[in-house]
Amino acid sequence: ACDCTDRITSQRAQYLKSIGINYVGRYITGYWAVSISEISLILEAGMKFVPIFERSGNDLSGNMDVTDASYFTHEQGRQDALYAASTAQELGLPENTTIYFAVDFDAYDFEVDSNILEYFRALSVYLLHYNVGIYGPRNVCTRVSNAGYAKTSYVADMSTGFSGNIGVRIPSNWAFDQFYETSYGSGDSQINIDKVM
């Protein structure tokens, strides 16, 4: 598997499949939002699409910082659940698809307690027709999943310096484990990806 911010073209989709990629993760919102045509190319190449939610660019209002614990509130979880569901429907994602909500920073236990659990509690209430997944460091994935707020985990193991990854077992509900950034291909098929297993 892999995830990327590069646009998926026909050449890139065929190349990824040829090197053994079966799942492609892409953001559904923000700067690098996937398009319906990209999803079609992924599926037509015989791969599966993995939706990741994280606000960026025009998705943000005011001084929001999605890499800070203060972003993760109950109200923000409610808003993000509604936005993610609406976007998933527009993209034609089937019901019961798992959407991975990103906690893309080294969150400490006190931040998980004060903010992140409340955010995911709201997601679990307000995200209708889709499943809540979590993308983040091992500790955050484990804590949120053990609280019953995420069905599966997409582990940010590439961030080896995160305290939430050091000496922490991979969550028992892990579906994806991101571990290495690289570039593949050449010409029209060249693409930068994060390797995932």
PLM features: what roles do these ranges have?
Residues 1-4, 23-26, 47-52, 97-99, ...:
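Hydrophobic faces of well-ordered beta-strands that scaffold small-molecule active sites
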Residues 1-4, 13, 141, 146-197:
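Functionally critical loop-and-helix segments that line ligand-binding/catalytic clefts
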Residues 107-130:
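Active-site cleft segment of glycoside hydrolase catalytic domains centered on the general acid/base Glu
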Residues 1-23:
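N-terminal module-boundary/linker segments of secreted carbohydrate-active enzymes
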Residues 32-35, 59-63, 108-114, 142-145, ...:
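Extracytoplasmic/secreted cell-surface and envelope-processing proteins
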Residues 13, 39, 81-85, 117-124:
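Generic structural signal for well-ordered alpha-helices
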Residues 128-143, 151:
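Aromatic-lined carbohydrate-recognition surfaces of secreted/lumenal glycan-active proteins
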Residues 4-7, 26-106:
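Substrate-binding cleft of extracellular glycoside hydrolase catalytic domains
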